[in-house]
C-alpha cells in the first residue's frame, strides 16, 4: 500500500472521529432528540489501531520525513489523532523545535526554537480590527494559505493596554481553550509584562477514562497565569534621533541557557523534565554548570538591542537583517543576549541575534527567532513594538 493511500485513509479516520467528537461536545444552542448513549463497546474502532508497533513506527517515521512543510505537515498531526497508540508513537518520533527546527503541534509554540538557524515567520497587522496574526513561513504566499500560528488582539483600557494572544484569530476569550497568554502594557506604553496561561490538568489526569454524557458540560480546568518576561523601552527625554532602545528580562529563561555548552544545558533540561513536580513550581537541580559564576541558573536572560550603525548616504540607522527586512521603520530591531564581560562567554554569543523583527510591506512584518526563545515569547515581544510610545521616539 502506498504512503498516499495510507494518508488518505488516515484523513477519513480523522474526519470520522472529528464528527463523533463534535456531536459529543456540541453546546446546548441546538435542541437535539433525547437518545440513549450507545455503549463504548459498540463504537467502531479504527482499523489501524491494531497494526504491529514496528510497522506503525515505520509508517509514521516515513510521514514525518516526507511531510516537512505546511500544509502537507498536517498529515503528521492526523497520525497523532487516530488513537492512543498512534499518538504515543507519533510523539516519540516528532522531535521538539530545538532539535528539528519545525513546528508541528500547538505545544511547539511554547518550546524553544532551534540553536543553529532561526525559525522564520511573518506578522500581518489589521488596523481595522486591532489584530496581529503570526504565520509560519518566509513571507505571505500568493494563495494566502499560510499556516496560522498565533493571533493577538489589542484591547485598550483606562490605565493599560492588553494584547490577548490566542491560537485562533476568531476567538480571543480568556475562558477559551485557545487562549495561551497576554501582553500587558503600562500607562505610558514603555513597560510590558508577558503572561503565560497554563492549564492545570490534574483534574483530567485523575479521571482519564471518565466519559461525559452528551448533555453534560465538560468541567472547566483551572488556569494559572504566570509572568514569563518583562519588556522595558528606554525613555527618550532629550528627543535625540535614533532607534528605540529596549530590554527584555525573560524570567523563565536562565542566563546559563546561552552561556553554558549545549550538551550541559540539554543534560540539565532532561534531568528537570524527568523529575515530576506540581504545575507552576520550579524544579532545581544540583548539576554544576562549568562557568565562572555558579549562580547563572538563577539569573534571568536579558535581551537588548543590537547596536545599529549610521549610514551616511541613506541618512538612517542600519542593521544587517540578511534580506529579511526591506522597509525602514522605527519598529525594526534585533535582540542579542546581554552578557557581562566578566562571565568569559564566547565572543559569538555577544553578537548572536536571538530575535529580529522588521517591516517588509504595508502592515506586514517578519519575525525570526531562535533558541532559547519560543514562538509565543518572541511574538509577545514583537507585538509590544506596535503599541504607541511617544516618550521613546525622537
UniProtKB/Swiss-Prot annotation:
Ranges for domain F-box: 46-101
Chain positions covered by the region annotation Disordered: 21-44, 200-225, 268-297
Tissue expression remark: Ubiquitous.
Domain of life from the UniProt record: Eukaryota
One example of a Gene Ontology biological process annotation: regulation of DNA-templated transcription
Compositionally biased spans, kind Polar residues: 26-44
Gene Ontology MF term list: transcription cis-regulatory region binding
A GO cellular component annotation in the UniProt record: cytosol
Entry similarity comment: Belongs to the TUB family.
Annotated protein name in UniProt: Tubby-like F-box protein 2
GN (gene name): TULP2
Amino acid at each position: 500500500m502506498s504512503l498516499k493511500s495510507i494518508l488518505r485513509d488516515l484523513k477519513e479516520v480523522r474526519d470520522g472521529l472529528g464528527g463523533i467528537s463534535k456531536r459529543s461536545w456540541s453546546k446546548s444552542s441546538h435542541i437535539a432528540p433525547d437518545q440513549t448513549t450507545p455503549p463504548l463497546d459498540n463504537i467502531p474502532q479504527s482499523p489501524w489501531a491494531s497494526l504491529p508497533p514496528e510497522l506503525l513506527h515505520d509508517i509514521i517515521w516515513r510521514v514525518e520525513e516526507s511531510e516537512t512543510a505546511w500544509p502537507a505537515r498536517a498529515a503528521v498531526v492526523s497520525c497523532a489523532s487516530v488513537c492512543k497508540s498512534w499518538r504515543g508513537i507519533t510523539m516519540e518520533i516528532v522531535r521538539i523545535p530545538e532539535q528539528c527546527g519545525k513546528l508541528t503541534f500547538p505545544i511547539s509554540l511554547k518550546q524553544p526554537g532551534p540553536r543553529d538557524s532561526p525559525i522564520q515567520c511573518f506578522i500581518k497587522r489589521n488596523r481595522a480590527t486591532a489584530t496581529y496574526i503570526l504565520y509560519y513561513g518566509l513571507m505571505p504566499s500568493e494563495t494566502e494559505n499560510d499556516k496560522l500560528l498565533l493571533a493577538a488582539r489589542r484591547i485598550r483600557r483606562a490605565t493599560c493596554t492588553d494584547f490577548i494572544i490566542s491560537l485562533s484569530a476568531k476567538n480571543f476569550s480568556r475562558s477559551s481553550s485557545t487562549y495561551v497568554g497576554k501582553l500587558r502594557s503600562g500607562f505610558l506604553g514603555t513597560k510590558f509584562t508577558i503572561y503565560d496561561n497554563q492549564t492545570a490538568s490534574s483534574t483530567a489526569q485523575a479521571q482519564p477514562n471518565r466519559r461525559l454524557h452528551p448533555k453534560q458540560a465538560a468541567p472547566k480546568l483551572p488556569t494559572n497565569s504566570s509572568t514569563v518576561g518583562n519588556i522595558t523601552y528606554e525613555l527618550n527625554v532629550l528627543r535625540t534621533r535614533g532607534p528605540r532602545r529596549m530590554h527584555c528580562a525573560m524570567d523563565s529563561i536562565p542566563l546559563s541557557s546561552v552561556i553554558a555548552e549545549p550538551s550541559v544545558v540539554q543534560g540539565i533540561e532532561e534531568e528537570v523534565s524527568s523529575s515530576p513536580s506540581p504545575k507552576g513550581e520550579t524544579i532545581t537541580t544540583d548539576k554544576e554548570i562549568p562557568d565562572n559564576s555558579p549562580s547563572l541558573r538563577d539569573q534571568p536572560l536579558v535581551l537588548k538591542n543590537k547596536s545599529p550603525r549610521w549610514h551616511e548616504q541613506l541618512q538612517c540607522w542600519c542593521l544587517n537583517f540578511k534580506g529579511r527586512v526591506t522597509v525602514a521603520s522605527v519598529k525594526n530591531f534585533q535582540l542579542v543576549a546581554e552578557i557581562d564581560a566578566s562571565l568569559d562567554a564566547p565572543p559569538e554569543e555577544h553578537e548572536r541575534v536571538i530575535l529580529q523583527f522588521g517591516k517588509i510591506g504595508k502592515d506586514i512584518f517578519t519575525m525570526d527567532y531562535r533558541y532559547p526563545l519560543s514562538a509565543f515569547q518572541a511574538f509577545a515581544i514583537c507585538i509590544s513594538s506596535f503599541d504607541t510610545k511617544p516618550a521613546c521616539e525622537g
